[in-house]
Amino acid sequence: MSSKSIELPVLGQVLRLNCPEEQHEALKQAARELDLRVSEMKERTGILQLERVLSIVALNLSYELLQAQQKTTSIEALLQHRIQQLDHSLESILTQKVNN
């Protein structure tokens, strides 16, 4: 995986980053999403201080990430439980076949 430089317009500035080329499109999309969220937050709240708006957007993004992680953990636990149930059912069926 080789890194290549990418320029991303973020909040009226250009950030130059090195990252694997296959991540370029995702980073561009993330930069657009950040710009959009900051613009929406400024418009919705009327807050003009960029640092304050960025803090609120960062908090919202962190909250969304935490919610997604909790949902993933819950789904993983549910799937693990279901796999154990299926495994137990298969063992029971195989045991019955061997005993018959």
Swiss-Prot record:
Main location: cytoplasm
Role summary: Activator of cell division through the inhibition of FtsZ GTPase activity, therefore promoting FtsZ assembly into bundles of protofilaments necessary for the formation of the division Z ring. It is recruited early at mid-cell but it is not essential for cell division.
InterPro entries named in the record: Cell_div_ZapA-like (IPR007838), Cell_div_ZapA-like_sf (IPR036192), Cell_div_ZapA_N (IPR042233)
Keywords associated with the record: Cell cycle, Cell division, Coiled coil, Cytoplasm, Septation
Source organism of this protein record: Pasteurella multocida (strain Pm70)
Protein encoded by which gene: zapA
GO biological process, alphabetically ordered: division septum assembly; FtsZ-dependent cytokinesis; septin ring assembly
Domain of life: Bacteria
Protein name: Cell division protein ZapA
